[in-house]
Amino acid sequence: MSKEDLIEMQGKVEEVLPDSRFRVTLDNGHQLIAYAGGKMRKHRIRVLAGDRVSLELSPYDLNKGRLTFRHIEGRGPRAPQRGAR
């Protein structure tokens, strides 16, 4: 599956679960289980209950997601990513 096939959404972390998983409520009200993406683990980005996050969903399973960005209050949305080098 290519990166273009993923659905990008935003939501709020409701609960921190074991094994670096999180219960997230999307802006449209849908709840799902998400895990921290590889770069978030690598850079030890801490995600707490109540944080606003961006996540990617597979079009094949809308009940699981991958956290890709933690939004910090007072900072604007992240810049769009450039293509691969």
From Swiss-Prot:
Keywords: Cytoplasm, Initiation factor, Protein biosynthesis, RNA-binding, rRNA-binding. Residues 1-72 form the S1-like domain. PANTHER family: TRANSLATION INITIATION FACTOR IF-1, CHLOROPLASTIC. CDD domains: S1_IF1 (cd04451). HAMAP family: IF_1. It holds the Pfam family eIF-1a. It is found in: Cytoplasm. The keyword Protein biosynthesis applies. One of its GO terms (molecular function) is rRNA binding. GO terms for cellular component: cytosol. One of the essential components for the initiation of protein synthesis. Stabilizes the binding of IF-2 and IF-3 on the 30S subunit to which N-formylmethionyl-tRNA(fMet) subsequently binds. Helps modulate mRNA selection, yielding the 30S pre-initiation complex (PIC). Upon addition of the 50S ribosomal subunit IF-1, IF-2 and IF-3 are released leaving the mature 70S translation initiation complex. Its main location: cytoplasm. InterPro entries: NA-bd_OB-fold (IPR012340), RNA-binding_domain_S1_IF1 (IPR006196), TIF_IF1 (IPR004368). The keyword Cytoplasm applies. Component of the 30S ribosomal translation pre-initiation complex which assembles on the 30S ribosome in the order IF-2 and IF-3, IF-1 and N-formylmethionyl-tRNA(fMet); mRNA recruitment can occur at any time during PIC assembly. NCBIfam families: infA. Belongs to the IF-1 family. It comes from Paracidovorax citrulli (strain AAC00-1) (Acidovorax citrulli). This is Translation initiation factor IF-1 1.
